[in-house]
């Protein structure tokens, strides 16, 4: 204050700095010198010598404020730097964490891709979403809930658990069993183990699966039941990378719960009785064929090969508690194998006694309307021995027995008329080894649905049994036919008017049969004897044809026939008793006694006529076809040997004009009886003369059948036979035969049409006397014909 008073200029010129600085509002006078003041503050020249406490205190107070601001500024910059470092470090840590997370997820996805079979099978690695989707599908397939509800309790509403189980086991043809993986104890086995392994359920309950398998398969079974890591895991080759690594992941996957098990082992087969009704046919066949490992020795168990397929499951299942007395209850959650066992039939040989179980061997064939094979099943090799190409293009009649050919033809014609209906016929089929097999053929036609035309005939041919085992003899064995070579059997389809000369010769040889009873049907003009020609010039033509056909130089057998002809056969008849325009033949040899018993023939030749009831259609047609063998074309003379030449006591001579007016079945100058002759007259005609034995029985029919016009000149003349052998029962009838020899015999017209062949008299004779009742014991060789009893 003293200084201020002493220096007034300074006091007025220089305002005090303290209030100005303190107030912060400088006056107008010092506005222009703000910079100076600032420089003065920087230099602080006047402050050094100012000892005033107030002023000094003011200057010191200003310096402290500036230093504190610098400290704050420096502290703030340090904080900002530290926060930036923290943020940078935080960002780096987050990136590292994300990178690690992505790496882990990639590793897990890769591992999942290796575990899912559908992913590992792809050529290129799929994306993550595809891997996850395939993994879900694979898990659903393992659980078996792909098309069911999420709780896994779905089952068909119309089936109970037992019905569903039986259907599954029947379809699989095996048995279901559940085995504990730790101990091998059998938890459950189905009742179908009995037909498969021949063992009851009681033998499996309470035992272990190790007791049921072969001792050599125990280690394999223990490996399949194991759910832990195997210490001796091998090494596997990764085909993708080409590297060899340990079996780690695959082993873990194989041992995880729900993994599949499929193995083959040998199981013990029991000896309990098998009820064939309670199981299907396939199980019964397998039961008979289960000796695939060879026959077991006495006292040793018998084993069969069983294929087991199943899954490893948790036992007990979730939500199921075992009873306290169960030995598995105190061991916690365990695993079990649920599998189905089936017999491995491929290791079993073919059964040799399958004929008692299986159906007869059969094959399917297709034919056209004519019966020619157009398709043959491959099973024909096992049935008849032929390859399919050996049958294609050939007619089925060619492989049929000659006696059954017409029956087969009729069946084919009938099945065409039935149009879709099944027709069955049984005949003898010639196999490749030349044996006759009884074959039953069920045939039906296939029609085009648009044109309604028959496309083809489908036949199911079943081999019944071999005909060699049949006790039924053929006709060739009963009539003692001589062996004439393989060409003796002719086709039954050809008629008598269609035979070629060579076939006529074979036909004539076929008719050389001893012991024929129905000689009234024989063509007497065709007997190869020395001809006696009368004044009729026209009658020498058929004789010349006969001599040229059966000349001695044509066949060596004819020379023997001609040499054995007795001289009395050429003996002529005086023209006083016979018209001049007729040719005569005579023969004196007797017919040898037939091997048939005499009591089978009755004195029925003179009985009242009986109308024949024609047999059934098939039998009648067969007889009609066989009868064609006995009626060759006119002019062909059969060769009769002395031992087989029949004896006739009368000669029937018919004029040429009369023969021309007759129907085709009445040969020129022949003793041919129509097909409507009663078989009752046949036994008598076998030994007595035809004019004396058979024709008297026809005189009573004169009212019904008038003689044909033009036959007045052709009356039947009779002459006593020389050396004729007569059956004893007919000796008493000779007088009546001779008394009726001069009667005019009227030929009975045939009941059939002219184009229809006459019945083979041998067959009619075997039918026997209709006035008596015959049974099959008297005719054991004719099982194909029904017994005729009236």
UniProtKB/Swiss-Prot annotation:
Protein name (Swiss-Prot/TrEMBL): Aryl hydrocarbon receptor nuclear translocator
Annotated CDD domains: bHLH-PAS_ARNT, PAS
Organism: Bos taurus (Bovine)
Region Required for heterodimer formation with EPAS1, residue ranges: 112-264
GO biological process, one term: positive regulation of transcription by RNA polymerase II
Paired cysteines (S-S): none
Residue span of region Required for heterodimer formation with HIF1A: 112-168
Glycyl lysine isopeptide (Lys-Gly) (interchain with G-Cter in SUMO2) crosslink site(s): 58
Region (DNA-binding): 88-128
Residue numbers bearing the Phosphoserine modification: 77
Places the protein is found: Nucleus
Keywords: Acetylation, Activator, DNA-binding, Isopeptide bond, Nucleus, Phosphoprotein, Repeat, Transcription, Transcription regulation, Ubl conjugation
């Amino acid at each position: 204050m003293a200084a201020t008073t002493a220096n007034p200029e300074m006091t007025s010129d220089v305002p005090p700095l303290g209030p100005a600085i303190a107030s912060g509002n400088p006056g107008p006078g010092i506005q222009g010198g703000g910079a100076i003041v600032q420089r003065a503050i920087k230099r602080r020249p006047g402050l050094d010598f100012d000892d005033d406490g107030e002023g000094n205190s003011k200057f010191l107070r200003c310096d402290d404020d500036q230093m504190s601001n610098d400290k704050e500024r420096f502290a703030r910059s340090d904080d900002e730097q530290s926060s930036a470092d923290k943020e940078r470090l935080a960002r780096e840590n987050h990136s590292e964490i994300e990178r690690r997370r992505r790496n882990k997820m990639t590793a897990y996805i890769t591992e999942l891709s290796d575990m899912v079979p559908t992913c590992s099978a792809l050529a290129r690695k799929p994306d993550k979403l595809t891997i996850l989707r395939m993994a879900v599908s694979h898990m659903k397939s393992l659980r078996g809930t792909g098309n069911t509800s999420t709780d896994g309790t779905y089952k068909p509403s119309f089936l109970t658990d037992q019905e569903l189980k039986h259907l599954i086991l029947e379809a699989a043809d095996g048995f279901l069993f559940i085995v504990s993986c730790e101990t091998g104890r059998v938890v459950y086995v189905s009742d179908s183990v009995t037909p498969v392994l021949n063992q009851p359920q009681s033998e499996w309950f309470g035992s272990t699966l190790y007791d049921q398998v072969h001792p050599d398969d125990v280690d394999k079974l223990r490996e399949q039941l194991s759910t832990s890591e195997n210490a001796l895991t091998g090494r596997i080759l990764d085909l993708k990378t080409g590297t060899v690594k340990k079996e780690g992941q695959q082993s873990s996957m194989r041992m995880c719960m729900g993994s599949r098990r499929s193995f083959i082992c040998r199981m013990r087969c029991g000896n309990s009785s098998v009820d064939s009704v309670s199981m299907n046919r396939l199980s019964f066949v397998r039961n008979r064929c289960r000796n695939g490992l060879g026959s077991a020795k006495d006292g040793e168990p018998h084993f069969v090969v069983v294929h087991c397929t199943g899954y490893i499951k948790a036992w007990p299942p979730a939500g199921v508690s075992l009873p306290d007395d169960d030995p598995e209850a105190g061991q916690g959650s365990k695993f079990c194998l649920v599998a189905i066992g089936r017999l491995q039939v491929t290791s079993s040989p073919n059964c040799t006694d399958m004929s008692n179980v299986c159906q007869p061997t059969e094959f399917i064939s297709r034919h056209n309307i004519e019966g020619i094979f157009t398709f043959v099943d491959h099973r024909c090799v096992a049935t008849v021995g032929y390859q399919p190409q050996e049958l294609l293009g050939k007619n089925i009649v060619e492989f049929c027995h000659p006696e059954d050919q017409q029956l087969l033809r009729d069946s084919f014609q009938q099945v065409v008329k039935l149009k879709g209906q099944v027709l069955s016929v049984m005949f003898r089929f010639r196999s490749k080894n030349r044996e006759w097999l009884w074959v039953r053929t069920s045939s039906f036609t296939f029609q085009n649905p648009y044109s309604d035309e028959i496309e083809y005939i489908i036949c199911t041919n079943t081999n019944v049994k071999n005909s060699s085992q049949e006790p039924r003899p053929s006709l060739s064995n009963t009539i003692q036919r001589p062996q004439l070579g393989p060409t003796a059997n002719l086709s039954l389809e050809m008629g008598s008017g269609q035979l070629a000369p060579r076939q006529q010769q074979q036909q004539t040889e076929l008719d050389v049969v001893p012991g024929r009873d129905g000689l009234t049907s024989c063509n007497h003009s065709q007997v190869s004897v020395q001809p006696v020609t009368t004044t009729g010039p026209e009658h020498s033509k058929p004789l010349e044809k006969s001599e040229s056909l059966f000349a001695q130089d044509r066949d060596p057998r004819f020379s023997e026939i001609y040499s054995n002809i007795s001289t009395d056969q050429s003996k002529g008849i005086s023209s006083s008793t016979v018209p001049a325009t007729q040719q005569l033949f005579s023969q004196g040899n007797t017919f040898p006694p037939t091997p048939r018993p005499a009591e089978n023939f009755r004195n029925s030749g003179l009985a009242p006529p009986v109308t024949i009831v024609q047999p059934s259609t098939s039998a009648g047609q067969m007889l009609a076809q066989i009868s064609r063998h006995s009626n060759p074309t006119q002019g062909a003379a059969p060769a009769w040997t002395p031992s087989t030449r029949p004896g006739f006591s009368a000669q029937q001579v018919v004029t040429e004009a009369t023969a021309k007016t007759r129907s085709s079945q009445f040969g020129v100058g022949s003793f041919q009886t129509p097909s409507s002759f009663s078989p009752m007259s046949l036994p008598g005609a076998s030994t007595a003369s035809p004019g004396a034995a058979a024709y008297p029985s026809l005189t009573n029919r004169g009212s019904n059948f008038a003689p044909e016009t033009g036959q007045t000149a052709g009356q039947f003349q009779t002459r006593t036979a020389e050396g004729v052998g007569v059956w004893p029962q007919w000796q008493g009838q000779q007088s009546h035969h001779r008394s009726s020899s001069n009667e005019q015999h009227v030929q009975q017209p045939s009941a059939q049409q002219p184009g229809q062949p006459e019945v083979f008299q041998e067959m009619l004779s075997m039918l026997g006397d209709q006035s008596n009742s015959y049974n099959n014991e008297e005719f054991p060789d004719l099982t194909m014909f029904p017994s005729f009893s009236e």
